[in-house]
Regions:
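Short, flexible loop/hinge motifs at secondary-structure junctions
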Residues: 1-189, 229, 258-259, 404, ...
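Catalytic center-proximal scaffold of phosphoryl-transfer enzymes
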Residues: 1-6, 113, 151-153, 159-517
Length: 517
């Protein structure tokens, strides 16, 4: 009896011990999850907004090098870093590089006394010697351009008595007037240059209309923001919309489209609260198209039917994020974004960098970086995204993707199945996101023109997001629609290397639509 009691007690203690261990494991996972949340919030509030995370250890193969490959975005050229014993400094751009695209005005300072101090003869110029450059700023100026039409009179009419006998004195004299260009905005003093500057200031420089109003006042003109808003809406309908429709037709004629969307607040939407968030959808052409066409589309909701409304029966490839609304595009072939996968893995990295060597999140980032490194190699770019050699031909790129990239993708998803993160953790969400998107993340292998990420569309969203931080909201749906069309023109012109303000002036003076490239 005593032995049985002891055995039962041992069994009960073992069961209790197992239960406590299980509970401890659950609590540890909960602590890990909560710590991840705290670290993420700290990073969001106090940390760097960049995803550049570098950990180098060339002597230890287990250490990782978490490069910035996935988030390179055809970004601006960065200054070369030069190592100095005590610190690092950025190599300065040369003066010639800074000033190379500006017009030049030469000033020759003449010798005041051109009498030879040796013999008294006159001295003549034989050359000029360069002294220095200076960068000159000419403040903007406003002036009135008064339009007149010439009136001409025939010098012969009225003097031929036999021919003009039946005409009265007024009809005998023949006059003609020149044709004046139509006013850009009827019954206004708006010029192409003025309106182009207002639109450029708002949509390229992110200046809200109240600041433009103040700027005009500083130049001596009382131009209200209401007047400017009305001008913008009218010109968008009359001049921007025809160009927008041509851009849309060209976008839809291509085999690949990048898509994304972001929030916008519109105050006076019928039947909706002013606090309700609307959406600005963004569509753009791929890099392989040779043109950068960006189209913004204002919609009241995020529903996937908005993408269907814009793209219609488009049957090409659509590169996008993991939003399920894109599944409504039943004719199109959806492709995923590895930058989103990598970003979620970066968010799951331990705050202690010493743990990166054994972190599953870091291993995931490293695997993503291998994919991005190969893509850059195929495109002839270095690790900073700069073009350093000729890219592979489409045929060669397609072949090497299937030979070299596809096995890495297979390994990546097989590895994901072995990761067992704490439920609800950042890592769990990152793993689940990648697995949910698996079908679409293989999509870029189908066509060499499809990019591995949707960074192109995210870059196209950025100008709108920057502007939104300043002007905060649109007053009406008409204003939001006008903004969508004008953002499309301004951003596309800029992406294609044009001076957007000069492009707008030419467009406003033209009788036919002019594409921004």
């Amino acid at each position: 009896m005593e032995e049985q009691r002891k055995e039962r007690t041992i069994d009960e203690l073992a069961a209790e011990n197992d239960a406590l261990r299980k509970k401890a494991d659950e609590l540890n996972k909960e602590i890990e999850y909560l710590q991840q949340q705290v670290n993420f919030l700290k990073k969001s509030v106090f940390g760097s907004k960049s995803e550049k995370k570098v950990l180098h250890d060339t002597e230890n193969a287990e250490q990782l090098s978490l490069f910035n490959e996935a988030e390179t975005e055809a970004r601006r050229e960065e200054a070369e870093e030069v190592s100095v014993p005590a610190h690092k400094r950025k190599k300065k751009r040369s003066r010639a590089e800074i000033l190379k695209d500006l017009p030049v005005e030469e000033v020759v300072h003449e010798v005041e006394d051109k009498t030879c101090d040796r013999c008294g003869s006159e001295m003549k110029q034989v050359g000029k010697e360069f002294v220095h450059d200076e960068l000159v700023y000419v403040p903007a100026k406003l002036f009135i351009r008064k339009h007149f039409v010439e009136v001409v009179k025939c010098v012969s009419c009225g003097k031929n008595e036999s021919r003009d006998a039946e005409l009265d004195d007024i009809e005998k004299e023949h006059f003609r007037k020149a044709t004046a260009p139509a006013m850009l905005i009827p019954r206004s003093f708006c010029s192409p240059e003025l309106l182009a500057h207002i639109i450029y200031s708002k949509y390229n420089n992110a200046m809200p209309l109240y600041r433009i109003e103040q700027d005009m006042k500083d130049h001596g003109v009382m131009l209200s923001r209401t007047t400017m808003a009305n001008w913008i809406i009218k010109i968008a309908e009359e001049k921007a919309k025809p160009v927008y429709e041509l851009m849309k037709a060209e976008l839809l004629s291509g085999r690949i489209i990048h898509a994304d969307e972001t929030v916008v607040q519109v105050l006076h939407e019928q039947g909706r609260s002013a606090k309700t968030q609307s959406r600005m959808w963004v569509y753009c052409t791929p890099a392989c198209s040779g043109k950068y066409l960006v189209l913004y589309d204002y919609c009241q909701t995020r529903g996937g039917y908005n993408a269907v409304s814009f793209l219609g029966n488009y049957s090409g490839y659509v590169v996008c994020d993991g939003y399920d609304g894109y599944n409504r595009l039943t004719q199109a072939k959806r492709c995923g974004c590895f930058a989103h996968v990598r970003r979620k893995l970066v968010e799951a990295l331990p705050s202690d960098k010493e743990l990166w060597a054994t972190s599953a999140a870091a291993e995931g980032v490293r695997r993503c970086d291998r994919l991005f490194a190969l893509e850059r190699e195929f495109d002839g770019k270095d690790k900073d995204g700069k073009q350093v050699r000729e890219p592979l031909s489409p045929e060669e790129k397609h072949r090497r993707r299937n030979e070299e990239v596809r096995p890495l993708l297979d390994d990546f998803f097989n590895w994901l199945m072995t990761v067992n993160p704490a439920g609800g953790s950042k890592l769990a969400k990152a793993v689940q996101y990648a697995l949910n998107e698996k079908r679409y993340l293989y999509g870029f292998l189908a066509d060499p023109g499809i990019e591995i990420s949707n960074n192109r569309a995210e870059n196209a969203v950025r100008p709108f997001v920057v502007g939104r931080k300043n002007w905060l909201f649109s007053d009406s749906p008409k204003g939001a629609e006008a903004s969508a069309m004008l953002y499309s023109l301004v951003v596309s012109a800029k992406m294609n290397g044009l001076n957007a303000e000069e492009y707008l002036v030419r467009l406003f003076r033209s009788d036919v639509p002019m594409l921004p490239y």
